[in-house]
Amino acid sequence: MTSIIYSPKDIFEQEFKTSMRGFDKKEVDEFLDNVIKDYENFNAQIEALKAENEALKKAKYQARNTVSATVQQPVPQPTRVAQSATNFDILKRISKLEKEVFGKQIIE
């Protein structure tokens, strides 16, 4: 993008040379031409940002719809056999640990 020539402070502090009948017309015209260029650049930047903003909103909407569709799909449930086998293994281990702990207490 093109660069901005004047900041708001530059415009506010601009002083023109005076000639016999007031300000130098050529200098004022050049300054105003540059201000017009700045406004055109600002408008171009605003339009580009609006387009980018709209594209991002569409992408966000599409991503949200994709996530919603994914979340709505049923999650496969784990098989009951694997869960019962896990429970059985846990019970065996607890039983073994109890025998070790209580067996040592009986000996003492």
From Swiss-Prot:
- Supply the alphabetized keyword list: Cell cycle, Cell division, Cell shape, Coiled coil, Cytoplasm
Keyword Metal-binding assigned: no
Residues in a coiled coil are: 32-69
List the GO terms this entry assigns under cellular component, sorted alphabetically.
cytoplasm
| Pfam families assigned to the protein according to its UniProt record, in alphabetical order | DivIVA
Q: Where does the record say this protein resides?
A: Cytoplasm
Record's family?
A: Belongs to the GpsB family.
Subunit record text: Forms polymers through the coiled coil domains. Interacts with PBP1, MreC and EzrA.
Q: Which PANTHER family match?
A: CELL CYCLE PROTEIN GPSB (PTHR35794:SF1), CELL DIVISION PROTEIN DIVIVA (PTHR35794)
Identification of the protein by name: Cell cycle protein GpsB
Q: Which gene encodes it?
A: gpsB
